[in-house]
Each structure stands twice: as structure tokens, then as C-alpha cells.
Amino acid sequence: MLLTTTNTIEGKEITQYFGIVSGETIIGANVFKDFFAGIRDIVGGRAGSYESVLREAKETALKEMSDHAARMGANAVIAVDLDYETVGGSGSMLMVTAAGTAVRYQ
């Protein structure tokens, strides 16, 4: 499954549009709380374990979106957008959403 942030696929013809597809994942309260605690503790460095959790959440959302597109008969998703948003009563969870347009190209 080809995923791209652009509205076209260079050198390819889009033959069918299937519509909007999306995938979501939520990082639980403890991971999110620990994430910000780790950020406060880091000075001039990177929090590898927290980046790993965010990367995994992003990949899960992209896979869910891709699977949805494949079930529709698409072989690509164009105009892919990733959003990160706090959710929950006190904003204690992080939701990662991937969305785009499912298409078939040749």
C-alpha cells in the first residue's frame, strides 16, 4: 500500500477514488503522564523510549488506515495527514489519527 502526503502520485494515473479513510490509536494515561515527566527530566537530549511509543502509535494508526483502504479495493492513500490530540477528562491520553483519501492508481 502506497502512502503519500501529496494529492497526486507522480508519474501515475489515479483511476478511482474510494473516499476518506482513517485510523486511530490512543496512548493510555500512564504512558502519556510518564512521557511528559520524562520530557521535564531531559535537558538537551532525546527521550528514546517515549519517541518509540509515539512512533508505534503513529505506525498503528497508519496501518489501520491502510487496512481500511485495502478492504475498499484501494492500492494507495493520498493526502495523508497525521494529527496528535490530547483526549480524556483531564487530557491524560494522546490520540494519534491518520487520515487520507483511498485511491486506485496504475
UniProtKB/Swiss-Prot annotation:
Pfam families: YbjQ_1. Gene3D superfamilies: Hypothetical protein apc22750. Chain B. InterPro entries: UPF0145_dom_sf (IPR035439), UPF0145_YbjQ-like (IPR002765). Transmembrane segments: none annotated. Belongs to the UPF0145 family. This is UPF0145 protein BDI_2732. It comes from Parabacteroides distasonis (strain ATCC 8503 / DSM 20701 / CIP 104284 / JCM 5825 / NCTC 11152).
